[in-house]
Amino acid sequence: MFFANIEKHSNFTYYILFFKFCKIRGELVTYKEKLLEKYPDLIYEITWTKEKDDSFLQITLNENNLEKITEYSKEISNILDNYEKELPSKYFLDISSRGINLSIQKENLDNYLEKYIEISLVNETKKIKGILWEIKNETIILKVNFKGQFRKIEYKKNNINLIEEVIK
């Protein structure tokens, strides 16, 4: 008898009652719920901001690969198109990476073999970029590009002040 009394009310009341009924049964899902359901580990944050007369839906992802972020942006935009009644008529969609901690601990260097890194040496201001080629007990070997020629250079771990991952 849930729907028996609805016919006596306006369309708006019908919509509200139907919405509450479906929500209780778990049939209606908000855009946030849908996005978090589809991308539980990917979405870091969903926020609305307003600047002057413009509304921005900002979605921050746990992803650093630009190509993947572009793919996810298209997918998320398509999902949001199905929720246009729930969203403002005009808004800007801003999807970005939350970034990463680029600092690498010496104990974790094994995870960065054959990856592009940058090191800072103790008592030197110049940073050296290269591919982490080999890891030994007390040293690392970087494959460094010197004017178009690659050279493998060995650095003592205790002479390295900071190691950072380089995103190309």
Swiss-Prot record:
Q: Which UniProt keywords apply?
A: Cytoplasm, Ribosome biogenesis
Q: Where in the cell is it found?
A: Cytoplasm
InterPro entries given in the database record: Ribosome_maturation_RimP, RimP_C_sf, RimP_N, RimP_N_sf
Offer a single GO CC term for the protein. Answer: cytoplasm
Record-level GO BP terms: ribosomal small subunit biogenesis
Domain of life per record: Bacteria
Membrane-spanning residues where? none
Give the UniProt family note. Answer: Belongs to the RimP family.
Which HAMAP family would you find in this protein's record?
A: RimP
Query: What does the protein in this record do?
Result: Required for maturation of 30S ribosomal subunits.
What name goes with this protein? Ribosome maturation factor RimP
- The protein's organism comes out as Mycoplasma mobile (strain ATCC 43663 / 163K / NCTC 11711) (Mesomycoplasma mobile)
